[in-house]
Amino acid sequence: MALQWTTLGLHEALIASELNLEGKIQLHDGMEPNISVQLAEFGDLPVQITVSGAQLMVSSALWEASQVKDLARFNELALKLNPVNALSNIGLITLAPGRDLYIMFGELSASSDLAHVIEEIRVLADNTIEAAEAFADQLISRVTSNSGVQS
């Protein structure tokens, strides 16, 4: 059986890796520890990594739902994009009552080798930037999201 990552183990492996993931890598402790990677090659885009059981989730914030002109239209476009952009999906999480945040996310097995984890991080970052550019006309104004992606 392959090694199954823990958040701490993955954090240490990312720091020690020779696979050249350029950026700031931080471990955030708490009820559900996660790793934050600020990717220099993608304009310091922050990407979050969470290991939970057999699953590893990589995500990056897009923008708050309040920044979207027409939520129904945007949701339809996002759902149509997901099958075409199979490695990353757009989701919606609640930050607080009345505050929803669109995210780009991808998942893989917590048993994936480090090269695949790093590839997922890079692909997700690239897809986040592409989504920000593709959906710019769906936003109320040009905003800088929590992820630092300007649309």
Please report, for each region that a protein language model flagged, where it lies by residue:
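Short, aliphatic-rich beta-strand segments
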Residues: 101-106
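Ampiphathic alpha-helical segments that act as solvent-exposed interaction surfaces
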Residues: 73-86, 107-139
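Charge-rich, low-complexity N-terminal segments
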Residues: 1-50, 87-88, 93
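A short acidic-to-branched-hydrophobic micro-motif
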Residues: 46-64
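Residue-level signature for short turns and capping positions that connect secondary-structure elements
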Residues: 40-42, 63, 109
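Short, highly charged C-terminal tails/helix-capping segments
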Residues: 136-151
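Short, internal acidic amphipathic alpha-helical interface segments
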Residues: 59-100
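Beta-strand-connecting loop/turn residues
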Residues: 31, 54, 98-100
